[in-house]
C-alpha cells in the first residue's frame, strides 16, 4: 500500500564486477572443489582407458538391471544426463513473442536426437518425446561430444542420440495414471496414454495427456514507513486451477535408402482461471483497520503446432534437407477486483482484460557436402515470420467517469499502446564449416547473416530494419578420449520480446495495473567468450566439467524512464548501452563406486555469476536485474536392482544477496531457502511402476523485500519498505505406469 514518506539514502556499490567475480572464484569453497577434482583426476589416470573415441555408447543391455520403462529412465542412469522422470509430461508453451523465435541450427547445452534426427518442432520436440518412447524400443544411446557435419544440430556442448531398433513391426501402449495431493487438501487427477511402434518403414508415436498444474500460493506481507513505524499487513490466498491437456503425434517415414521424412503435430489446452482473496490491515498510527478484496481472473490458453522435414542423401554422401514449422498460441484473461464490505456487499474497483495471439511460421533449407578430407560445409537459409496481436482494456471505479459495458461497467482508462500488432519477418542465410583436423581436434566455424524487418501497427505505426553478422568458432581438443577442452567465441543477437513493445498487465505488483510498452526497442547482442573442460571418469564412474565464460553486451536491455510530459512516472524495457557478465559453472555427476556403492549416483553443481551495468535511473554501477550471485544444487539417486526400486533427493539453492530488480520508483530484492524434492519408485505386479514424488518437501518461503519511493527513485524520497514471503506448500503425487 502506497503512503508518503521522507528521504533515505540509496546504497551504492562501486566495486568492480570483475574483482567481485574473481574474489568469489577464489573462495575456500572453490579451493576445496578443485582439490577434490584434482584428486579424482589423479587417481583415475591409473585406471584403464575405455577407447579412442570421445563418443560414449550405452547399449540397451547396460540399462537392463534398472528395468527402465521409458527412454528418459535410461538417460537418467547416465552420469551427467539426469532429468526428472516425474517432471511435467504435459505440453509447454514456448512463447515466441518473448524471444526464441525461429529454429536455428541448435543451441548450447545438451541436445536430443532420435535416430540421428532432430524433431522439427519447438513445443513438440525431441526432448518431450523421451518420456513417450518405450525403453524396449531403444537399441543404444550415444553421448556425442564432438562436432561433425553429419549431425543434425550444431553448437551443442554434447548430444544424446537415442537410436531405436529397426524391426519390421512392433507396437507398445504405455499408460500412466496420476494423482497430485496439495497442502490445502486439494487433489487433482492426471494421466497419459502413448501408443507407439514401427510398421514397416514408419515409426510412429501418438500421445494424449492431462497434467494437473494447480497452485495455491499463500502470501503474507508486512510494510513499514520511513520512520520504521508499522504501515500495514496484507494476507493473500492466490489459487490457480489449471490442467493442461495435450494431444500430439510424431511420425518418421523412411521413404527409401536415400530419403526420409518426419512430421509432428501438437495441440495443447491449458485454461488457467485464478482467484485471489486479500485481507489488508491498516496499522498506521497504532490503528487496526481491516479491509477485504477479492479477485476473479478467468483465463484461457491454447497452442497448436505442426512441423515436418524431408531429407535426401545423394550417392556421394551430400545431404539436402528442408523443414517447416507453424504454431500459434492464444491467451486471454479478464481480471476483475471487488471491495468486500462487512455486510457481505461488494463493489467492483478494477477491470483488466487482455488478449493476445502469437503466430510463427518457419521454413529452413540446407545442403551439406564434403569439400576436403575431414571437412564438410553446410549452407542454406531460414525464414521466420512472427506476428503478435494484442489488446488491453482497463476500467477503474470513478465517481465522475461514464461507465462502459466493454470495461466491466467501470470507467474506461486510456492505455497507450494497448491495441497493437507487431510483425517480424527475419531471414538468416548461413554457412557452417566443419573440420576434423585429426582424431583429437575439430573446429566448427559458422557465419550467419541476420536481417529482419519489424512493423508495428494499431495505436502506433512504426517500421524498422535490422541486420547483424553473427560469426562463431567452436574448437574442441580431446587431450584423451576422456578429457576434452572446448573454446568457443560467438556473437549472439537476442531477439526482441514482442511483449516489451506493447502495454501489458503487471502480475507482480498489486499497486500497478499495467506496464508500458516501448516501440523503439533495438535488439541487444553480445560476444560470448567460453572455455569448457570436461572429464569422464573411467569405468563409467561419472563426469566432471568446469565452464567459465564472459559476455560483453551492446545495447543491453533493462528498465528505462519513459515518463510522460504530464509528469506521470513510468518505466519500460529499453536499451541502455554496454554491460558485462561473468559466469563460472562447476558440475559433477559421480557414482560412489569407490565406496562399493556403484548404484548411488551423486550430482552437484555450483554456479557463480557476476555482472556490471550502469543504472539508467541513478547512474550507479550495479548488477543486472534479477541476476543473482549464482546457485548450488545437490542430489543423489540410489538404485536397488534386486528390489527393483530407486529413490532420490535433490536440492536447489540460490546464493542470496544480489537478486535485485531496479525500477524507476522501487528496488526489489528476492531471497529464499533451499528447495528440496524427493521421489521413491519401484516396480511390482508384473512390471507396473509406482512412483511417489514430494515437491517442496520443506514448504519453502520465497521472499521479496521492496523499497518504494515517491516519484522518481533519483529524488530519493522513501515511501515504504515491504517484506513479503510466499509459499505453495508440499505437493505429493502418485504415478502408476506400465506397458501393454
Q: Where in this protein do the model-derived segments appear?
A:
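Extracytoplasmic beta-strand/coil segments of soluble accessory domains associated
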Residues: 49, 56, 72-122
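N-terminal periplasmic accessory domains that precede
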Residues: 71-74, 100-101, 112-115, 128-129, ...
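Short acidic/polar hinge/loop motifs at secondary-structure boundaries
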Residues: 118-145, 193
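A beta-strand signature from Gram-negative outer-membrane beta-barrel systems
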Residues: 135-172, 739
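Transmembrane beta-barrel wall of Gram-negative outer-membrane proteins
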Residues: 183-218, 229-276, 298-314, 473
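Membrane-embedded beta-barrel scaffold of Gram-negative outer-membrane proteins
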Residues: 321, 385-387, 484-490, 494, ...
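Gram-negative outer-membrane beta-barrel transporters
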Residues: 549-552, 570-658
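C-terminal beta-signal and adjacent terminal beta-strands/loops
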Residues: 655-658, 682-740
Amino acid at each position: 500500500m502506497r503512503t508518503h514518506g521522507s528521504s533515505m539514502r540509496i546504497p551504492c556499490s562501486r566495486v568492480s564486477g570483475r574483482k567481485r567475480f574473481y574474489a568469489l572464484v577464489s573462495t575456500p569453497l572453490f579451493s576445496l572443489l578443485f582439490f577434490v577434482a584434482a584428486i579424482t583426476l589423479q587417481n583415475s589416470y591409473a585406471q584403464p582407458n575405455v577407447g579412442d573415441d570421445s563418443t560414449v555408447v550405452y547399449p540397451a543391455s547396460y540399462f537392463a538391471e534398472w528395468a527402465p520403462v521409458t527412454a528418459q529412465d535410461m538417460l537418467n542412469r547416465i552420469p551427467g544426463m539426469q532429468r526428472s522422470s516425474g517432471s511435467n509430461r504435459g505440453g509447454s508453451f514456448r512463447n515466441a513473442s518473448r524471444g526464441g523465435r525461429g529454429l536455428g541450427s541448435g543451441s548450447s547445452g545438451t541436445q536430443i536426437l532420435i535416430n540421428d534426427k532432430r524433431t522439427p518442432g519447438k513445443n513438440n520436440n525431441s526432448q518431450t518425446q523421451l518420456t513417450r518412447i518405450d525403453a524396449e524400443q531403444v537399441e543404444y544411446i550415444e553421448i556425442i561430444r564432438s562436432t561433425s557435419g553429419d549431425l543434425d544440430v550444431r553448437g551443442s556442448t554434447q548430444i544424446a542420440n537415442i537410436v531405436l531398433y529397426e524391426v519390421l513391426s512392433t507396437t507398445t501402449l504405455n499408460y500412466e495414471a496420476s494423482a497430485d495431493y496439495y497442502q490445502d487438501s486439494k487433489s487433482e487427477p492426471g494421466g497419459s496414454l502413448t501408443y507407439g511402434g514401427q510398421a514397416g518403414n514408419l515409426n510412429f508415436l501418438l500421445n494424449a495427456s492431462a497434467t494437473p498444474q494447480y497452485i495455491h500460493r499463500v502470501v503474507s506481507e508486512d510494510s513499514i514507513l520511513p520512520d520504521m513505524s508499522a504501515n500495514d499487513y496484507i494476507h493473500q490466498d492466490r489459487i490457480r486451477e489449471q490442467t493442461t491437456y495435450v494431444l500430439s503425434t510424431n511420425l518418421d517415414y523412411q521413404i527409401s535408402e536415400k530419403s526420409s521424412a518426419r512430421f509432428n503435430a501438437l495441440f495443447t489446452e491449458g485454461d488457467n482461471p485464478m482467484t485471489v482473496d486479500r485481507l489488508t490491515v491498516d496499522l498506521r498510527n497504532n490503528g487496526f483497520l481491516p479491509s477485504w478484496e477479492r479477485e476473479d481472473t478467468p483465463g484461457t490458453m491454447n497452442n497448436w503446432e505442426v512441423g515436418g522435414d524431408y531429407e535426401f542423401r545423394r550417392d556421394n554422401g551430400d545431404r539436402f534437407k528442408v523443414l517447416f514449422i507453424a504454431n500459434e498460441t492464444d491467451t486471454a484473461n479478464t481480471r476483475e477486483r471487488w471491495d468486500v464490505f462487512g455486510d457481505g456487499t461488494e463493489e467492483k474497483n478494477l477491470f483488466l482484460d487482455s488478449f493476445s495471439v502469437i503466430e510463427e511460421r518457419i521454413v529452413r533449407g540446407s545442403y551439406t557436402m564434403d569439400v576436403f578430407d575431414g571437412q564438410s560445409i553446410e549452407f542454406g537459409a531460414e525464414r521466420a515470420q512472427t506476428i503478435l496481436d494484442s489488446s488491453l482494456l482497463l476500467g477503474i471505479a470513478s465517481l465522475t467517469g461514464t461507465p462502459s459495458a466493454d470495461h466491466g461497467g467501470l470507467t474506461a482508462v486510456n492505455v497507450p499502446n494497448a491495441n497493437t500488432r507487431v510483425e517480424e519477418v527475419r531471414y538468416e542465410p548461413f554457412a557452417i564449416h566443419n573440420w576434423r583436423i585429426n582424431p583429437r581436434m575439430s573446429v566448427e566455424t559458422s557465419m550467419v547473416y541476420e536481417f529482419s524487418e519489424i512493423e508495428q501497427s494499431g495505436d502506433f505505426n512504426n517500421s524498422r530494419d535490422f541486420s547483424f553478422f553473427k560469426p562463431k568458432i567452436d574448437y574442441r581438443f580431446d587431450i584423451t578420449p576422456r578429457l576434452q577442452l572446448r573454446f568457443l567465441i560467438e556473437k549472439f543477437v537476442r531477439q526482441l520480446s514482442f511483449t516489451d513493445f506493447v502495454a501489458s498487465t503487471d502480475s507482480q505488483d498489486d499497486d500497478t495495473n499495467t506496464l508500458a510498452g516501448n516501440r523503439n526497442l533495438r535488439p541487444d547482442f553480445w560476444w560470448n567468450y567460453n572455455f569448457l573442460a570436461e572429464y569422464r571418469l573411467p569405468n563409467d564412474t561419472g563426469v566432471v566439467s568446469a565452464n567459465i565464460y564472459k559476455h560483453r553486451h551492446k545495447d543491453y536491455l533493462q528498465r528505462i524512464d519513459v515518463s510522460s510530459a504530464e509528469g506521470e512516472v513510468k518505466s519500460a524495457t529499453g536499451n541502455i548501452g554496454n554491460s558485462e557478465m561473468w559466469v563460472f559453472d562447476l558440475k559433477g555427476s559421480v557414482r560412489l563406486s569407490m565406496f562399493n556403492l556403484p548404484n548411488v549416483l551423486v550430482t552437484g553443481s555450483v554456479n557463480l555469476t557476476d555482472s556490471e551495468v550502469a543504472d539508467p535511473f541513478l547512474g550507479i554501477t550495479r548488477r543486472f536485474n534479477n541476476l543473482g550471485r549464482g546457485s548450488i544444487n545437490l542430489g543423489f539417486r540410489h538404485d536397488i536392482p534386486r528390489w527393483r526400486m530407486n529413490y532420490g533427493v535433490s536440492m536447489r539453492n540460490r546464493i542470496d544477496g544480489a537478486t535485485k530488480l531496479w525500477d524507476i520508483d522501487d528496488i526489489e530484492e528476492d531471497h529464499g531457502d533451499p528447495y528440496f524434492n524427493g521421489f521413491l519408485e519401484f516396480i511390482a505386479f508384473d512390471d507396473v511402476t509406482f512412483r511417489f514424488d514430494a515437491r517442496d518437501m520443506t514448504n519453502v518461503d520465497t521472499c521479496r523485500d521492496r523499497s518504494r519511493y515517491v516519484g522518481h527513485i533519483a529524488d530519493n524520497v522513501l515511501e515504504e519498505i515491504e517484506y513479503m514471503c510466499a509459499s505453495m506448500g508440499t505437493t505429493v503425487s502418485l504415478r502408476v505406469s506400465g506397458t501393454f
